[in-house]
Every structure is written in C-alpha cells, then in structure tokens.
C-alpha cells in the first residue's frame, strides 16, 4: 500500500509522523507549534501525505507539511508552515491594519515564496504565480499562487513570529465572519 493510501486510511496526527521523521530539535519545535495551535483552539486535520490543514470557521489558516523537500539533503528531516493568504481573495490588501509590528512585517517579507513551478501535473505547471503583488508595502515581481508564505524548519524567534502570524489570520477570519464575509 502506498504511503498516501495508508495515511488516507489512518489520517495520522502530525505528531505521530513527526516523531518518525524529525530530529529531536525539529520535533520539539513542531510539538511547541502544535501546543500553540491547541491552546488557540486550532486543530490540524490530515490533508494529504505528510500534510495537514489548519482551519478556523471553515477557512484555511495554514498548512503543516513534513518531509516536503525532495531536492534537499534535509529530506526526511523537514517541516514547514505554509500559507496562501497573500494571494487568495485579495486578502493581502486587508492585512495592513492587522500587521503593524515591524518585526512581524520583516518576518513575512523574508518568507514570501516566489513561484517555482509547483503543482505540476503531467508535466504541465499549474501554478505560475501572481505577478506584481504588493504585500505590506513591499512589491514582489511574482508570488507563488499555491503557498505565498513558506516558513521552513522554524525555530526560536522565527517560530514565535509564525505563531503571531497564525493569530493574525485567525483574527482576520473572525472579523470577516462578524462582517458576514467569511
């Protein structure tokens, strides 16, 4: 049975797969992030092989992915937090009032993901990115349309900013719901 089929049947928890794949330091960071999510009433749900989606009010907050670096020497010892919030439904235009901390802005700018031919199907590139995107006052030539923000192996301050970003998204989604737009 393929890994995908096995996981689809079992729908494993992030921590169970993380314990199999990650070294001690990266595992500790994943577990800290999962504890943060739990404390904020956010639960990762299995999405696809080694990937979980975190939703709030039925809107995606982020995805957690393990083992997603096939061209890397780190394969099998990788985790990341992925978000598409800077390209979907023009949400990026509305974040200015939510993100005022310069450190958080710098974190976001440092983790914007350029298009790289992801989502290939049968040799056809489905994701060509979004051209000329301005995020929090900084313009990018192009941003990945699948995962506009990618935080690879976060730890320390990077992990703290990732948590802060998740709270911003949750607050934004809650405000949309109150306004009847979610």
Please report, for each region that a protein language model flagged, where it lies by residue:
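Short, conserved beta-strand/beta-arch hydrophobic-aromatic motifs that form part
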Residues: 47-180
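Terminal, regulation- and interaction-focused segments at domain boundaries
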Residues: 1-36, 40
């Amino acid at each position: 049975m393929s890994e995908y089929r096995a996981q689809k049947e079992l729908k494993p928890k992030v921590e169970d797969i993380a314990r199999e794949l990650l070294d001690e330091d990266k595992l500790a960071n994943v577990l800290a992030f999962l504890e943060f999510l739990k404390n904020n009433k956010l639960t990762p749900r299995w999405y696809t092989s080694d990937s979980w989606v975190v939703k709030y009010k039925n809107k995606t907050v982020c995805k957690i992915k393990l083992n997603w670096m096939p061209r890397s020497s780190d394969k099998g010892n990788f985790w990341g937090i992925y978000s598409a919030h800077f390209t979907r439904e023009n949400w990026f235009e509305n974040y200015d009032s939510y993100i005022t901390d310069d450190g958080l802005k710098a974190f976001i700018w440092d983790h914007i993901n350029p298009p790289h031919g992801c989502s290939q199907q049968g040799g056809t590139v489905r994701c060509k990115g979004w051209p000329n995107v301005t995020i929090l006052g900084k313009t990018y030539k192009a941003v990945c349309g699948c995962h506009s923000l990618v935080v690879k192996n976060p730890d320390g301050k990077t992990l703290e900013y990732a948590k802060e970003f998740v709270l911003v998204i949750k607050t934004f989604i809650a405000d949309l719901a109150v306004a009847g737009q979610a």
